[in-house]
Amino acid sequence: MKVRPSVKKMCDKCRVIKRKGKIMVICPNAKHKQRQG
């Protein structure tokens, strides 16, 4: 899980979602997991 000021899709399979007010990227590729912090 990467914590970044700006989250971006890194590939076609990445999904940008909002969970408990936090913007997150979920993806089958574990390296692409990110959340905004």
UniProtKB/Swiss-Prot annotation:
A GO biological process held by the record: translation
Residue stretches in coiled coil: none
Keyword check for Plastid: yes
Pfam family, one: Ribosomal_L36
One Gene Ontology cellular component: chloroplast
This protein's UniProt keywords: Chloroplast, Plastid, Ribonucleoprotein, Ribosomal protein
Locations listed in the record: Plastid, Chloroplast
Presence of keyword Lipid metabolism: no
GO molecular function: structural constituent of ribosome
Highest taxon listed in the record's lineage: Eukaryota
Primary location class: plastid
Family stated for the protein in its record: Belongs to the bacterial ribosomal protein bL36 family.
The protein's name in its UniProt record: Large ribosomal subunit protein bL36c
Species name: Trieres chinensis (Marine centric diatom)
